């Protein structure tokens, strides 16, 4: 862990998957299947995780995109983080792109928890 990571963890409470992220584990991922199929797999995975919960899942919009609102509760202090996921069609290639962001509900810094939330989510689909 470098100095910038420490400062970031004390001053930011948000992380997002970004194509330009220095860390390749914090980039959007592609998964085979339609947005609906991929959203189903995300839902199935969340249902197997004791500290994750599905708050809402929207119906596909006109472009087929599906939005999910998830939460993850930390173990020790039971802090709740909101994770917003978008599953979008990857240009009709038989795959979908998973985009997500994680936001702490409490505090000014997350000590890297939001990035860990995103890595945990995407790690299940890499």
Regions found by a protein language model. Name each.
Residues 1-126:
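Ser/Thr-rich, low-complexity intrinsically disordered terminal regions
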């Amino acid at each position: 862990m470098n100095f910038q990571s420490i400062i970031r963890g004390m001053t930011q409470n948000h992380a997002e998957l970004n194509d330009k992220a220095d860390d390749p584990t914090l980039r959007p991922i592609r998964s085979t299947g339609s947005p609906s199929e991929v959203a189903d797999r995300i839902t199935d995975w969340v249902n197997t995780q004791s500290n994750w919960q599905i708050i809402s899942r929207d119906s596909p919009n006109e472009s087929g995109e599906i939005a999910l609102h998830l939460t993850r509760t930390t173990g020790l202090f039971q802090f709740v983080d909101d994770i917003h996921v978008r599953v979008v069609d990857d240009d009709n290639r038989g795959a979908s792109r998973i985009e997500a962001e994680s936001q702490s509900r409490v505090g000014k810094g997350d000590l890297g928890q939001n990035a860990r939330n995103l890595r945990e989510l995407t790690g299940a689909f890499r």
